Amino acid sequence: MKRSKNFEKRKKFIMELLGDPLYKPMRLREIASLLQLDKSEKKELFDVLDELCAQGKAEVDNKGRYSKVSGKRRDRRKNKEALKAEKPERGRKGRERREKNHEEYRFSEKDGTLMEGTFIGHYKGFGFVEVEGQEQDIFIPENDTGSAMHQDKVQILVRNGHKEGKRQEGVVLKVLERGMPSIVGTYQSSRDYGFVISDNPKFSKDIFISRKNSMGAKDGDKVVAEITDYGSRNRKPEGKITEVLGNLRSPGTDILAIVKSFNIPSVFPDKVLRQADRVSDHVQEADLDGRLDLRNLVTVTIDGEDAKDLDDAISLTKEDGIYHLGVHIADVSNYVQGGSALDREALKRGTSVYLADRVIPMLPERLSNGICSLNQGQDRLTLSCLMDVNEKGKVISHKIAETVIRVDERMCYTDVKNILEDTDEVAKKRYEALIPMFFLMKELSGILRSRRHTRGSIDFDFPESKIILNAAGRAIDVQPYEANVATRIIEDFMLLANETVAQEYCTGDYPFVYRTHENPDPEKIESLLMLLHNEGVNIQKSGQEITPGEIQEILESIEGMPNEAQISRLTLRTMKQAKYTTECSGHFGLAAKYYCHFTSPIRRYPDLQIHRIIHDRLRGRLVREGRTEHYKEILDEVARQSSVCERRADEAERESDKLKKAEYMSYHLGEEYEGIISGVTGWGLYVELPNTVEGLIHINTLRDDYYVFDQDAYELRGDITGKIFRLGQKVRVRVADADKMLKTVDFVLVEED
């Protein structure tokens, strides 16, 4: 055998590769692809591997995959046969066959039904395909995923022979459209190459990165990698690093990685910033033309202590049994013109995003914290919903007007709460002149809440999480953050304004964007009613579909039960996600016939959009200038884009919280806590701690019995002992693991003495 001068060097390099901790057993063609070898070099690789196997330094399994020898030497003849089996087909036909998806020539339509959908990956290698209009996803076994990756649009063949009660199985025939042109992950370097391991566990394949495409990334760096070759069933995808975000341990890199992974725009283009800089930082005299002057009306803002983008203010008086409520909203549309660079960027973002260590605003801070923010003592342009409300909480008359206001006090929730609960003498003295208005607000808020309750509005009152970070961005505490009397006042007044505006524009049949919420999924409701029945709670539906009032009845019937919070969450999960539409189809959760988002134009694009419509109507432009047709053309896309951006922001915010909770718990490994079982599944028990952190007790750590999941009763039951774990049950747990990368917390059960 004729050898090149570098044969021994290459043999040494291959041994280092096989021994690398990151290396996973590969076939000959996979190794050749990984090393980007040409035809002649591939032949030498064959010889190198052959000799290493003969020397007992490497071994090959029955699938032709090579690894460093692990104490058991293989027969050389078997190795050679496996190597021969791995030799690629020669010529055009062989090349074409290799390039085709392996399933395209193994299956035909007679074997099943062709469908198209979105591939949802799983970290274990298998996946699911979501098919529009089909309730249950199609399961795709690991060996049948082809080159499909998470979020790809794929064509699949759903196999015949589906048994009732079991999930349908399919095989990926073809990738129609790639869903993820790039990924965010952690770079792991080796000698002459590296891999990017995706932060998204649904993206199960590591991306091979050659040294020349690494952008100088170091081991452990968070990076963005563009996928240049999606690989195949037997070959890893390849890519190039396009951005190095920083080392994993650097402050803020972890959250920045989440921002990048969700493709959330975080840097404003220069053109947008220049346009924002041209906006005056004070109200111009010309801006007041045609506006109702309410600067002498006593108004306050009530927000969180740290809030800087104050987009709503309140005024309230009472006369002859009638409440005169003013909800005054920042007139952002006066400064952000439709179709401008500012507007296009705002639509692209859709919403402000609130992450654990940062806010990514929809608008540049010069606007959101400046001229658009209703800052104390400064003239500000607003759109006001002025409502007369009777003592039953009914709006008996209203007016929507272009206004100018001057806020008298910038209040925070804590001060208003303490004043109303008589716990802060300093605050009471400081805001003495406003105290009667605050108590009037509390009075009206209670009336409005009671009225909504009577019509069937559903109130899920869960504590949110407040994550405390230190200067380095590390989580040092996690606390529950619950609603209070002050937050409820603002919520009730904003809901009323949103309903009032929506009703006027829906009954007037104007083009508009509504906030709609469909009825829950009937199957999920049936499962919930079965669970409640097992808990001794029987709810009878009045018709085919459940009503908001019946959901409210469920929540009232479980009040005071040990598992109240957990069943409330399960009830919430039966709900569909609210969205933006141009059809006024009602809001199930609020039991409202009319609803929109009018009150937050600084941080939500639909609010900004409907402000423009209101302006055009008030100034007669809808008909006179043909604006009605313009809005009919654009609003469907505005609603769709806004819904997509909202879901993206919600998911990013959840991931941010999960990451920081896992980080916090990683500093408390081995510590014990009291918790409540918040979820029961076939793979274990979810337990929620008083600080809102949730973790999993894996079923394989429950070693005292063999536990079986009863889906109808929502419990784990010991096969031998009969021991039961149920929703809402108190347990004591020890923190076993907290994985910041996977954003998970693992507990083990602390057995009772």
Feature names for model-found ranges:
Residues M1-G326, S333-D379, K417, Y714-L716, ...:
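Charge-lined substrate channels and their catalytic hotspots, especially those that engage the 3′ end
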Residues Y230, A257-K260, I264, K271-D705, ...:
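Electropositive polyanion-binding surfaces
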